[in-house]
Curated annotation (Swiss-Prot):
PROSITE patterns: GLOBIN, PLANT_GLOBIN. GO terms for cellular component: cytosol; nucleus. The lineage of its organism: Eukaryota, Viridiplantae, Streptophyta, Embryophyta, Tracheophyta. Leghemoglobin that reversibly binds oxygen O(2) through a pentacoordinated heme iron. In root nodules, facilitates the diffusion of oxygen to the bacteroids while preventing the bacterial nitrogenase from being inactivated by buffering dioxygen, nitric oxide and carbon monoxide, and promoting the formation of reactive oxygen species (ROS, e.g. H(2)O(2)). This role is essential for symbiotic nitrogen fixation (SNF). This is Leghemoglobin-1. It comes from Medicago sativa.
Length: 147
């Protein structure tokens, strides 16, 4: 099954909703990550020395990058049917940080929960599936670059 124009549009519109309140949704995203995997705190330099998730420029920048990469993956999936990493260092960075398969699952769950929150009454199973497919393609590309 190919990624459709409608799926790309759903990802793009909810990406815009996410960006409209980046501070709030960044904190929400990392709070969900740490609720699901408290040990993941050590993977993020901007979280290591704080008792709880707090808004910061680094936190926002990283959240924007994660969600932006998934959005870019949606665009690539629609255009080419696959995802090629624009940043060749992503695999090495994830290896250096000690990222393993279960971390990708946690990030996916947190990402989908955050998008549901950001989309509000525009959320649907179809929107969720579009983000899920785009995230899975990105995660596959990162894992490939890690090996």
């Amino acid at each position: 099954m190919s990624f459709t124009d409608k799926q790309e549009a759903l990802v793009n519109s909810s990406w815009e909703a996410f960006k409209q309140n980046l501070p709030r949704y960044s904190v929400f995203f990392y709070t969900v990550v740490l609720e699901k995997a408290p040990a993941a705190k050590g993977l993020f330099s901007f979280l290591k020395n704080s008792a709880e998730v707090q808004d910061s420029p680094q936190l926002q920048a990283h959240a924007e990058k994660v969600f932006g990469l998934v959005r870019d993956s949606a665009v690539q999936l629609r255009a080419t049917g696959g995802v090629v990493l624009g940043d060749a260092t992503l695999g090495a960075i994830h290896v250096r940080k000690g990222v393993v398969d279960p971390h990708f699952v946690v990030v996916k769950e947190a990402l989908l929960k955050t998008i549901k929150e950001a989309a509000g009454d525009k959320w649907s199973e179809e929107l969720n599936t579009a983000w899920e497919v785009a995230y899975d393609a990105l995660a596959t590309a990162i894992k490939k670059a890690m090996s």
